[in-house]
Amino acid sequence: DCGRPTVDAAVMRSYVLAAAEQGYPVRIHTIGDAAIHAALDIFEEARAKFGPLPEGRRNCLEHLENFLPEDLDRLAELQVVAAVQPPHMTLDPGGPERDLGPERVRFMWPFRTLLDRSTVLAFGTDSPVVDVNSMDVLYSAVSRRDPGTHEPAGGWLPDERIGMAEALRAYTQGSAAAAGRRRELGTLEVGKLADLAVLDRNLLACDADDIQKTKVLATFMGGTCVFER
């Protein structure tokens, strides 16, 4: 059972091709492997017809919960951003194994595999589906454990854990790429917006169990302090 497409594939194809002809990227909501595969086929056709999108613009897929193994390489090949929400992976403990079986579960939320294939990951919270706390996102990504229960011990599919530096990159540069705003956001550089948060600890040096204890000391937008503890 592949579920029901919200938008008919032929209609989606017409939207993507029309956008590609004008040089515009498209973001598609794709949860399961059938949706991901269909969207990548459309992006591939658009690229063949009209060439790569202009510099700084990338198509994006949202959620990408379980993959067909043959699609794992295609995101990087087609320069598609994978916008994912790490806390989703533990919303239904035991559910993936029950519904999909052990073979298909191996390709669920495969962050390590995607990064090893040079895919651009973009992190977000997907609030209100999960909590808006960004530290929960980082905790889930590096531990593969639920931010509320801290289960399972050792992490779910622990081989797909990523490092904190990689998680921060996904939450900054990756998210800027998903928004098509890498010239303005994602890194601290001359000429970009000075949007940043000051934290009470170095996330690159702290233990995974301490990530969620992090407090924001100050927030700056455009170089202006808009919050201070």
What does each of the following model-derived ranges do?
Residues D1-R13, L64-N66:
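Active-site gating/metal-coordination segments in enzymes
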Residues L17-R27, A34-N59, L64, P69-D73, ...:
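His/Asp/Glu-enriched, well-ordered alpha-helical/loop segment
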